[in-house]
Amino acid sequence: MSFKHSVRDSWLAASYAVGVSELYKKLWGRKRGIISYHNVLPLSKLPHFDTYNVDQTVEVFEKQIQFLQKHFRILPIQELGNPKAEGFFITVDDGMANNYSLLAPILDKYDISALFAVCPALVNGQYPHIWRDHLFLLLRQYQHQPIWLPFNHYREPLQVGINGETLNKLTRKLKKNVYEQQVADIYGLLKEICQKNEWSYELSDDEPLRYQFMNWSQIQDLHRRGHSIASHTMTHRVLKFLPDHEKQYELIESKKHLENQLGTSVDTIVYPYGSLAEIDESTIAIAQEAGYQLGLMNIQTHSLSHPMLALPRFAFPPIDTPAHLHAIASGYKFLFR
């Protein structure tokens, strides 16, 4: 941790202890917020290969929920479309198996309803993993041999270390390359990497809770229990890189699939990744044409034309310290960037 962050964290802890952050919350704090989660895992400590920092332990997740209920107000997810509703909403992205077996029971324990965003094509098995997870799993499985990657048009192999941090850095580097090249067919790129390295595209899955998806019966059961289901597109590709007809497939077909499976209307789209690097005005226009009423991002932006289709969210890191959770939820922390 840098000296700057150490000083900031000490100040946040002191502010919480003497009530300064609580005063900020009452006078100027965030009155409404949408919180994003992804995975909740049955571990005492998260592994260092959480490449995208989207995982929580069961224990920490439950403590975060307890904290929110004590200090803030968690609203029923059915109120999400009401702009006057003040409080916090819980959303969960990707539809992984742990969402059903571990995360949802904690929500049920505290009588909380949430929004689960799923990708129908991934539930149906069109692809075995979200591309970013598949990429990491491939690198992890074959890390002890030279690896050919598209950075230099496969001209020279890379020797990857056995350290998980090295794998994380390489995975992020590949993701950066995808963004720089604006790769639309990301799953095709994964198959190309496998062909160049003579790897099997299919992987043995020893972590089903983390890398496998819920099935339709589980998703339908969540809906019956009072949770809401949203589209997370069909395949979790980067929407901004796609031509309009592919965006239409991702947004319109996912909505149709979900409505057929659930027997009800689906009016919320949760954009994968959720920043302006992945979402453009064309995406918003197609979402509106598809009939979505709400669109969730991961940032605050005023540059897109339809505010209700570009609602901001925030996330908690995997911590349970009250001072930091309070500072993030209230917005107090962001005074000290």
Question: What residue ranges belong to the model's regions?
Answer:
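C-terminal active-site subregion of NodB/CE4 polysaccharide deacetylases
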Residues: 1-91, 98, 126, 130-138, ...
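Extended, charge-rich helix/loop segments that form flexible
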Residues: 27, 36, 128-225
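Long, hydrophobic, well-ordered secondary-structure blocks that form the structural core
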Residues: 91-134
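CE4/NodB-like, metal-dependent polysaccharide N-deacetylase domain
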Residues: 84, 96, 105-117, 169-201, ...
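Short, well-structured alpha-helical interface segments that form or flank functional binding sites
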Residues: 63, 98, 102, 214-217
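Alpha-helical segments flanking ligand/cofactor-binding loops in enzyme cores
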Residues: 105, 220, 284-285
